[in-house]
Amino acid sequence: MKLVVVGLNHKSAPVSLREKVAYSSDTLPRSLQALTRLDAVHEGTILSTCNRVEIYMASRDPDAAAAQTSQWIARDHALDPADVTPHLYTKAESEAVRHGFCVASSLDSMVLGEAQILGQMKQAYQDALSAGSTGVVLNRFFQHAFLTAKRVRTETSIAENSVSVASAAVDLAKRIFGDLSGHSCLLIGAGEMCELAARHLVTHGVKEVLVTNRTFSRAVDLAQQFDGHAFPIEALAENLHRADIVISSTGSTVYMVGPDMVKQALKSRRQRPIFLIDIAVPRDLDPEIGQVDSAFLYDMDDLNKIVNDNRQDRAEAAQAAMQIIEGETPLFIQWLDTLDVVPTIKQMRRKAEAAKDQLLQKHLAGWDLSDTDRQRVENLARQLVNKLMHDPTERLRSLTNEHDGDRYIDAARKLYKLDDD
């Protein structure tokens, strides 16, 4: 069994495509079931965040699994495969393990060292567990990935002074306004990203925090944390003009704000500029807003350019983290290889035991032996089988740790005619 990853991220695909292939919590269970119905996919997990959609799979045929999944991702979102597949990457075996460990440790994140991705990966794993789409391989892989991420965060400085997407958004606002003191902000959404943004905004002196959310009670709870004000999502249009800075991160599949709403808000503001940051995928803010005078719209792709400075500053910590990952990757591969060899070794031993039992049954019946002598013969036969099987099975177990270990398993199966039955 091999580990396979097929996906796209902020480096391989623009936000306009990432939002089209994103998975919502409502559709995820159905998609996980459909994924594991693909012929070459034995286990599957879907990781869908604002910056990536990745399919983690266990398969005996990595090439077939990758090909089937690449087509399936497009079909599952009613897209033309020709528009999706050029942006996909495929990783298998040790490369897939290394990539997954890097993702969990935030080395592959847009913001190097951010903490959100580990929680998102844990949630993706829990969703797959609930859907029954994981098994022995992915269960072990994700547990190993989480332990590796923990080592990276505790043994390196990767998490020190790291920024999040939310804090990067606030830094962008500071570049536009300079001093944020005296400015007001509106958060559309009440999840973790918006809460993080609110904390950074208040730290930098924002005078008023407004919050709206589809679930009004959550908006109230978040606003109260910052002595702010909440209003129902239905009142968004009539309140938009109150904000100098708008940060949006919801799970909506439709635009929350369009150009006409912004034009009306600017009219009420007497054309004072309004700064909008969309950190949602799919996007909350219609891209056409960027064409409106005095409205300055930024999305995840814009933030990606801004946080590159942070990535360069953290290169030394990233190098130390990669050393940990390079050490953990072969450990998982070795376990995976032994997983493949165990059934073969069991079959070899069962075949030897069956031959022993057949011979004992044939000959002992014609021998006039006491119970004690019969027991001695049976013990001798058992010891002989164990002795003869010990070296071949232990050697086979050892050889499977090599890069071409599969061929030794195949050879053993042919020599012992394990697939002839």
Swiss-Prot record:
GO terms for molecular function: glutamyl-tRNA reductase activity; NADP binding. Substrate binds at T49, C50, N51, R52, S109, E114, A115, Q116, Q120. Its EC number is 1.2.1.70. The active site is at C50 (nucleophile). The record marks H99 as: Important for activity. It catalyses: (S)-4-amino-5-oxopentanoate + tRNA(Glu) + NADP(+) = L-glutamyl-tRNA(Glu) + NADPH + H(+). It holds the Pfam family Shikimate_DH. It is an enzyme of class 1 (oxidoreductase). Homodimer. Belongs to the glutamyl-tRNA reductase family. Catalyzes the NADPH-dependent reduction of glutamyl-tRNA(Glu) to glutamate 1-semialdehyde (GSA). This is Glutamyl-tRNA reductase. The gene is hemA.
